[in-house]
Amino acid sequence: MSRLIIILSVLLSVNSIASESICYGTTSNGRLERGVKLPSSGINFVSYSVSASVLGRTYVHSTVRDIVVASYSRLKAEMPEKVFKYAETGFKKGGEFKPHKTHRNGLSVDFMTPVMNAEGKSVHLPTHVFNKLGYNIEFDRNDRYKGLSIDYDALAAHIVALHKEALEREVDLWRVIFDPGLQPNLFETKHGKYLKEHVQFSKKRSWVRHDEHYHVDFKVPCM
């Protein structure tokens, strides 16, 4: 009986290793093997586009998938009234991912900025073909867009959740790209001290503003 248990354990271990993704190169010049697709929705999150998912634009490294899904579970316990939405990630085999300059080896994920409506309720930022799946949205100087306002508490909590879930898997976040002009608002939340101490944010404005979404690169060992 004990011999059978050992054999089964070995087989399960081999199967687990075989199902893990392998990333190569960098986020800007790499590829991915055995990429996995993020779930289209969960109890407190949704994908930015069903059609984009069908077209294969929501694949990531298996470790990144586990981190992202677990972060939403953590947030459900901490902020049950909040909802979240993820956006572009990459192709199953990585490689060039237009129009993005990165997202090439399964370690890059875009998340749509959490927002609240006029009543202060957490809602999803609208993403459809008429606003380029949300990427064409621009918040004004008051952090508002068509009656919606940026939910900095939810945004900060999500980044913290991603970081903590990454550490539990013995990996990390490499960087978070978010409009530098808006970052002070993140640091004013209750998670501000943690973010300053543990998360590396972009210092300069990127080629796109990154106000309607924040880009996260994960630090996972690659070949």
Residue ranges and their predicted role:
Residues 1-7:
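Sec-dependent signal peptide recognition
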